[in-house]
């Protein structure tokens, strides 16, 4: 042996410069917390637990019927991921429509014709008014739009999903969403920077129509946001809110520890829902990880990253596809 040192010691030497830069640029406590992970020699790495059969396509009977309920994939200037979102809902048996806010403002498309509404991620208006705030105000302070959204939310046969920027936007509209009065606002990450990671999350038991049958599942998901901290100082009630998703560490425990929890929310909270389950918002991006080929890492049991065809385990789909199929089953 020419050279021999413990892996943790070499890792700390390698990461020291990055730690110093991060401590100057971002939250120094988070910089130290990430650096200290090198001291955990027993870290098992990401541990996945799927509490359902991901090979079962529960939406198949509804797809076979030929009926395709309409879902609006809503976006605003600066949004993204609408293509991945539309693809996932299309595969789950919906007719996914690309809807820009100008389509609603001009009357080209009506929410009254939709059964589902999905607000996608991104950075509407560059987040200059606060993440999702400008988008929400476009709705709140326009009589045509506020009436249309209130009517849509008030119908008993509709659902809505907000992801990332859409989560921030819908949280800012909590006052007009039935059952969302306990939702927080989502504000700047504790790390004081934009976080783009593959993070481990647990899906707790909840009434969310999107998460039915998934309770107890722990899976990786894409994260990409700068303002994901669940902030109850501005609105909401941490004691009453219904969790739909939370960050966990590599031992499966809900955590506030950085970087397992990239935004620092108490109890790992990163997704909430309503008591009837029709409305759910979350900061992570399930639409970006619905297939093996979209994953930067996945368990070998899911198939290799380049196995995306029908011969791959689960047909090339990850367990996240169940979220979209659940919505189709709920519509019936």
Task: Map each language-model feature to its residues.
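Cysteine-nucleophile active-site neighborhood
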Residues: 120-208
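Intein/HINT protein-splicing elements and their conserved insertion hotspots or analogous self-processing inserts
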Residues: 1-70, 78
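Short acidic loop-to-helix transition motifs that present clustered carboxylates
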Residues: 99-107
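Residues that mark the start of a beta-strand
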Residues: 68-70, 95, 220
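Amide-donor transfer/coupling interface in amidating biosynthetic enzymes
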Residues: 107-109, 146, 150-151, 183-332
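Generic beta-strand/beta-sheet core signal
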Residues: 74-76, 99, 117-120, 163, ...
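Short acidic/histidine-rich motifs immediately flanking catalytic phosphotransfer sites
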Residues: 110-118
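Short helix-loop-beta junction
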Residues: 83-99
């Amino acid at each position: 042996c020419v050279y021999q040192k413990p892996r943790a010691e070499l890792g700390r030497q390698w990461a020291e410069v990055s730690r110093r830069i991060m401590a100057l640029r971002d939250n120094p406590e988070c910089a130290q917390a990430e650096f200290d992970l090198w001291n955990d020699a027993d870290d098992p790495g990401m541990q996945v637990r799927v509490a359902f059969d991901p090979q079962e396509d529960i939406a198949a009977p509804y797809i076979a019927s030929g009926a395709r309920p309409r879902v609006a994939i809503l976006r605003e200037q600066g949004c993204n991921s609408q293509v991945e979102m539309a693809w996932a809902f299309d595969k789950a048996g919906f007719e996914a429509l690309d809807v820009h806010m100008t389509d609603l403002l001009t009357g080209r498309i009506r929410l009254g014709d939709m059964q589902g509404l999905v607000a996608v991620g991104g950075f509407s208006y560059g987040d200059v008014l606060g993440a999702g705030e400008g988008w929400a105000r476009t709705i709140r302070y326009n009589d045509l739009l506020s009436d249309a959204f209130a009517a849509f939310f008030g119908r008993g046969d509709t659902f809505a999903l907000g992801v990332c920027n859409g989560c921030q936007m819908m949280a800012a509209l909590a006052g007009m969403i039935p059952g969302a009065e306990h939702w927080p606002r989502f504000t700047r990450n504790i790390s004081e920077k934009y976080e783009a990671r593959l993070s481990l999350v647990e899906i707790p038991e909840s009434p969310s129509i999107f998460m039915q049958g998934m309770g107890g599942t722990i899976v990786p998901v894409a994260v990409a946001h700068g303002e994901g901290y669940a902030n109850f100082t501005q609105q909401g009630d941490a004691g009453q809110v219904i969790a739909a998703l939370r960050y966990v560490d590599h031992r499966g425990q809900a955590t506030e520890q950085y970087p397992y929890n990239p935004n620092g929310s108490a109890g790992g909270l990163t997704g909430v829902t309503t008591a009837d389950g029709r409305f759910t918002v979350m900061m992570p991006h399930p639409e970006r990880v619905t297939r093996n080929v979209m994953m930067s890492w996945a368990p070998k049991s899911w198939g290799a990253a380049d196995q995306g065809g029908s011969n791959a385990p689960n047909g090339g789909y990850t367990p996240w596809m169940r979220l979209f199929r659940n919505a189709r089953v709920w519509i019936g």
